[in-house]
């Protein structure tokens, strides 16, 4: 969502004073895809952390013109495991997968193959 405004070549040496890092928004690739969707299916991803996670993910799905959105939580960051919910355009959770990240990815891919591709 954000990147540093400027890149520093090499290593920044300590100077004994605080460093301020300015961030700028990155391009919204998912929104661009949604605007040019045509007949393609779009699966979006939403990392949400509060009690409104489902609502926020559904809002993102609609704003970005996705067909489904994968909701996951920050607890997955740095973890070997994950739990995701697949939410459709009607706001319904159509699948929940949990396990190792590899297992969850495999389950998600199987869902995509059987639901979208066929």
Predicted regions and their residues:
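Glycine-rich phosphate/dinucleotide-binding loop and adjoining beta-alpha-beta core of small-molecule
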Residues: 1-76, 85, 94-95
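Small-residue (G/A/S/T)-rich helix-start motifs and N-terminal tracts that mark the onset
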Residues: 66, 73-118
